[in-house]
Amino acid sequence: MENKFLCVMAGYDDETEKHLAGIQQKLYDVGLTGEHTKNIPQHITLQTYPPEQEGEVALMLEKIAAETKAFDVCFAHIGIFTGGKVLFIAPDKDLDLIALKEKFGPSFDWVPHTTMLIDEPENIYQALPVVVREFSSFHGKVTSIHLYEFWPTRHILTVNLR
């Protein structure tokens, strides 16, 4: 399938997950449900791979997780990507986060973020005041790495950081 891909994602502790999901739920509560994938953990995408590399990527993920300590992140930003179709909350791009990303691929043009909504620009602009109202800077924790395949969504593996 040409549309299939693997996605390696940094996952959060329960408190961070709940906090981010709560902000996203406020969007759903006002009818802004978007086009993004539902029923997956809040996350930061680290890298994508072709599906043929599943075994290799799973082994790499397990090795990296065993060598990497869980770490804190500071969520301090709200953003919209060029084109106006993605609204996100972003942590500071600190050394721990960059180090984890670079274990999977270069971080030069990478924007670490957790997507709140993917939708048409007019809906993103409606969603922005909701996120602004609900969001204030907070500290969270990256505690795991997930491996998913997309289209259709399939959870492959979650490994806790040490």
Feature map (PLM): residue ranges:
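Short, surface-exposed loop motifs enriched in S/T, G, D/E and P with embedded aromatic residues
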Residues: A70, C74-A76
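Short proline/glycine- and acidic-rich turn/helix-capping motifs at secondary-structure junctions
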Residues: A76-K85, S144-H155
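Charge-rich, low-complexity N-terminal segments
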Residues: G84-V86, F108-D109
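A structured binding-face within diverse protein domains that lines the active/interaction site
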Residues: I89
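Basic, often amphipathic N-terminal segments
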Residues: M1-A70, D92-K141, R154-R162
